[in-house]
């Protein structure tokens, strides 16, 4: 009976330790993820574009997401985007989806509006936290977010209809 009490006490202490560390872990993850970001540059097919050719704002906070982007890399074609979404995160997984998406393309003075989200439902990512760096990797391995206290680097190996490889560097503004 004495040993049973010791084992039970040890078990409950271990559970409390894991619960506290799990809570601290999710707080560390959220502190790196949540914030406001400004797009600094965009690399598409190994060509870097800076402001004013590209501009954008990303806000991730309290399970809500907002993104705006302007892409003016070609004088005859521009793309403007605004999206509202939701996300969920825990210490193992991150999910994000865009339930309201508006993409305005202007090419040779012709305007086209697309209101379809780039994917259905929520995209799933694995979560890795190491040395004050948060890495989110999609289950396909084609998209990733790397976040620290100063920045977010988003990489996509198949972005858009043309399936271009892009890297977007965002600085944290709050």
PLM feature spans:
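Lipid interaction determinants
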Residues: 20-174
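Bacterial Sec-dependent N-terminal signal peptides
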Residues: 1-28
């Amino acid at each position: 009976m004495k040993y049973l009490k010791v084992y039970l006490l040890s078990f409950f202490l271990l559970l409390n330790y894991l619960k506290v560390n799990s809570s601290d872990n999710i707080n560390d993850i959220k502190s790196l993820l949540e914030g406001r970001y400004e797009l600094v540059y965009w690399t598409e097919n190994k060509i870097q574009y800076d402001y004013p050719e590209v501009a954008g704002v990303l806000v991730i906070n309290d399970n809500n997401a907002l993104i705006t982007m302007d892409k003016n890399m070609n004088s005859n074609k521009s793309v403007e985007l605004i999206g509202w979404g939701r996300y969920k995160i825990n210490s193992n997984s991150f999910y994000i989806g865009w339930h309201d998406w508006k993409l305005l393309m202007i090419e040779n003075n012709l305007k086209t509006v697309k209101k379809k989200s780039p994917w259905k439902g929520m995209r799933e990512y694995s979560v890795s936290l190491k040395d004050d760096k948060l890495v989110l990797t999609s289950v396909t391995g084609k998209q990733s977010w790397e976040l620290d206290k100063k920045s977010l680097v988003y990489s996509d190996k198949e972005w858009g209809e043309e399936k271009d490889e892009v890297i977007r560097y965002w600085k944290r503004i709050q």
